[in-house]
């Protein structure tokens, strides 16, 4: 985890892309607070890959409130880490609650290719994009330049 703290990966059309290990609501909030205080005027886009459905269920409210300092959240599929999908968790409800509680725009992508396509179509100008999570998001962030 120490190696993955707000590491700059690449720049695309004036937008800087970073990678961070944050996968818990407190970490997400702290990283976004830090980015917001350093880049007051820039648009902040958080690409979030949730890690473990059990964690999402246990901390659902905290997660949905943790993105307030971002402008946009791009939600990736849950990295299950081998967990079986638990009943009683709705991904779409989770996405809606993030929008409502954190007051952000939110987009859902199904894989790294859809993520790259979304970035190509919507990202231009000076922005800060940070990929967060403890799953495969780090390798997605490193592969993005080749997919753009």
Q: Which stretches of residues belong to each language-model region?
A:
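C-terminal helical cap/extension that packs against the catalytic core
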Residues: 64-125
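Short amphipathic alpha-helical segments
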Residues: 30, 58-60, 86-87, 120, ...
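Short, solvent-exposed amphipathic alpha-helical segments in soluble enzyme
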Residues: 33-37, 61-65, 89-91, 125, ...
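Generic structural signal for residues in well-ordered beta-strands
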Residues: 6, 17, 106-107, 129
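Short glycine-rich anion-binding loops that position phosphate/pyrophosphate groups of nucleotides
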Residues: 50-53, 78-81, 134-137
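Nucleotide phosphate-binding/pyrophosphate-handling subdomain across enzymes
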Residues: 1-72
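A glycine-rich beta-strand to alpha-helix segment
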Residues: 114-145
């Amino acid at each position: 985890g120490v190696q993955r703290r707000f590491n700059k990966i690449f720049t695309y059309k004036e937008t800087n892309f970073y990678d961070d290990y944050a996968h818990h609501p407190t970490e997400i909030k702290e990283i976004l607070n830090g980015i917001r205080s350093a880049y007051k005027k820039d648009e902040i886009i958080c690409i979030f890959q949730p890690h473990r459905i059990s964690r999402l269920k246990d901390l659902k409210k905290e997660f949905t409130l943790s993105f307030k300092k971002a402008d946009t959240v791009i939600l990736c599929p849950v990295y299950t880490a081998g967990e079986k999908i638990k009943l009683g968790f709705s991904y779409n409800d989770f996405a809606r609650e993030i929008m409502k509680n954190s007051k952000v725009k939110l987009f859902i992508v199904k894989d790294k290719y859809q993520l790259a396509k979304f970035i190509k179509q919507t990202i231009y100008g000076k922005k800060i994009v940070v990929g967060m999570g403890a799953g495969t998001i780090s390798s997605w962030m490193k592969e993005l330049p080749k997919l753009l």
